[in-house]
Amino acid sequence: MTQEVRAAGAVLWRLAGRVTEVALVHRPRYGDWSLPKGKLDPGETIAEAAVREVREETGFTAILGRYLARTAYPVPSRTGSGTVPKTVDYFAAEAVSGEFAANDEVDELRWLEPAAAEKVLTRPEDVRVLRAFCELPVGLTTVLLVRHAKAGKRDDWSGDDDLRPLSEAGQRQAAALRRVLALFGPDRVLAAPRLRCVQTVHGVAEDFAAEVRHEPLFSEEGYWPDPVLGVARLLAVAGDGGTPVVCSQGGVIPDLVSALADRDGVELPAARGRAVPSKKGSFWVLSFRPPTAEEAPLLLAADYHPSALPAPSPSRS
């Protein structure tokens, strides 16, 4: 059986004054210039691997943004017979701290403007990823829209449904979300006033000593009397800047994401039955252009992550 090699990486960027620069690394083993990337460790998600590999190869701590692309190409099999497919998933990632030090894998790092970087990159696949990065500006606002984790069956719960807690499986999902959402640099946490929603993201808030703020418009009962108000509320949250986490319900998220995408002309990833996906424990990374004096935030990209547990790459808009 052919075993696919999974890897992840990032277009690591920074601002030098008003100029965007991206990091390229030189690997002496291969004699090439590439984007930082590497194989997934066992039990690791692509997001976790991307951040770890950036840190190991460049010395920089990074905050993830939008998903960019997947590349695929054959590599020699470990058995020495033939090749196996290798896939690499890439994110945009902002460098927030660190310093490069040469190591066995990478002996040089260059910060270049994208046009110059494109001429230096060795592999055409890396050029394609860099061009995907350049399709949108940097400095976007990220909203992490989460569906609550598993909470058992409603029919099996005899109490107030608002107080239905996470199941054991849901607790595992929440723990995974805590790890993965942290990679995007969240700075506040909002949730529909349902225990299962609050429990799903409580750990995220706890990591930066914050409280989970209740948002009734993101519950099913609060959203559906007037969905326009719910959309406006999410835009207001995005307009406040930073990186908010918003935990909502399965009866809200598909309509909310669809409404934003229709409003701003963003094509959503295809799903089974063409419904907007929203599995329990999944999340959307919504990338907005910040508001101006005349305009509200504008949705520019929407990436769906079906799970914070090790899983396939997200679907890209």
Outline where the language-model segments fall.
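N-terminal strand-loop-strand
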Residues: M1-L35, V143-H148
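Conserved Nudix-box catalytic region and its N-terminal flanking loop in Nudix hydrolases
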Residues: R18-T61, W157-R164
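Nudix hydrolase/Nudix homology domain
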Residues: G31-D32, G98-K153, D162
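Active-site-proximal alpha-helix that buttresses catalytic centers in soluble enzyme cores
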Residues: G38, G139-P225, P254, R263-D264, ...
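Unchanged
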Residues: L40-I63, T71-E125
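A short coil-to-beta-strand element that immediately follows conserved catalytic motifs
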Residues: T61-R70, A210-P216
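Generic beta-sheet signal
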Residues: T142-L144, D240-G251
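Acidic, low-complexity terminal tails and accessory targeting/binding regions
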Residues: R172, A176-R188, A210, E220-G242, ...
